[in-house]
Amino acid sequence: MNVLLCSINTLNRFYDISALEVGQHFYWQIGDFQVHAQVLITSWVVIAILLISTILVVRNPQTIPTSGQNFFEYVLEFIRDVSKTQIGEEYGPWVPFIGTLFLFIFVSNWSGALLPWKIIKLPHGELAAPTNDINTTVALALLTSVAYFYAGISKKGLAYFGKYIQPTPILLPINILEDFTKPLSLSFRLFGNILADELVVVVLVSLVPLVIPIPVMFLGLFTSGIQALIFATLAAAYIGESMEGHH
């Protein structure tokens, strides 16, 4: 009888989880436009965290660096190394862009696990990490596409488009298709990994509270950092590729 009751309770839990509505969104109506408020709120929170922490550390730099200053210098050096490795000697102007991508994605990913978004109640839906929404990841991927087009055209002019018929004009459709697959792979890889991580934690918390979810959350933090690094590295690689003109 006890086994039967346990089985029924387990099934009820699965039923409750499956009954959760997914994809609800909270919108603000601004004129004729609908603004996705959830993404906007969480994105501005992440931006505020980055701005405030940066201002507090660098507003008064010390000759003998503080621990916070040392940390930011290490992060900057790390971003420079990634940019130089992927872009080459002309990496300098692209460090701010690559760094912004990396830091925004990194803090966004970690905010999903460390910030209590769920306690903030909305009329519809709930808050989550900005990168948990496909709108954010697609926007970042499209921004990356604009960046590597700009990098190639600004260096080579209209000759940049000659790459589409290299090494043979027969590859023109494939080379054009590649420009569509790059942002698709960037956006869906980041979105899928962050969404899957949060769903796994939610399900495990529902089934086995405070036992299994903790190591899974630590694993999620690690993979979230890796995803930020992958996105920034690929963005730098695409920019370097467009400037060099080879595949």
Swiss-Prot record:
Source domain of life is Eukaryota
UniProt membrane topology term: Multi-pass membrane protein
Gene3D superfamilies xref list:
ATP synthase, F0 complex, subunit A
Q: Quote the InterPro entries the UniProt record gives.
A: ATP_syn_F0_a_bact/chloroplast, ATP_synth_F0_asu, ATP_synth_F0_asu_AS, F0_ATP_A_sf
Which residue ranges run through the membrane? Answer: 38-58, 95-115, 134-154, 199-219, 220-240
| Gene Ontology terms, MF aspect | proton-transporting ATP synthase activity, rotational mechanism
* Record's keyword annotation contains Hydrolase: no
Localization of this protein: Plastid, Chloroplast thylakoid membrane
Q: What GO terms fall under cellular component here?
A: chloroplast thylakoid membrane; plasma membrane; proton-transporting ATP synthase complex
Q: Which keywords accompany this UniProt record?
A: ATP synthesis, CF(0), Chloroplast, Hydrogen ion transport, Ion transport, Membrane, Plastid, Thylakoid, Transmembrane, Transmembrane helix, Transport
Q: What is its main location?
A: plastid
Pfam families recorded: ATP-synt_A (PF00119)
> Mind telling me which PANTHER family this protein's record contains?
ATP SYNTHASE SUBUNIT A, CHLOROPLASTIC
* Physiological role: Key component of the proton channel; it plays a direct role in the translocation of protons across the membrane.
Quaternary context: F-type ATPases have 2 components, CF(1) - the catalytic core - and CF(0) - the membrane proton channel. CF(1) has five subunits: alpha(3), beta(3), gamma(1), delta(1), epsilon(1). CF(0) has four main subunits: a, b, b' and c.
| Family as reported in the entry's similarity comment | Belongs to the ATPase A chain family.
Its protein name is: ATP synthase subunit a, chloroplastic
This protein's species is Cicer arietinum
Q: Name the gene that codes for it.
A: atpI
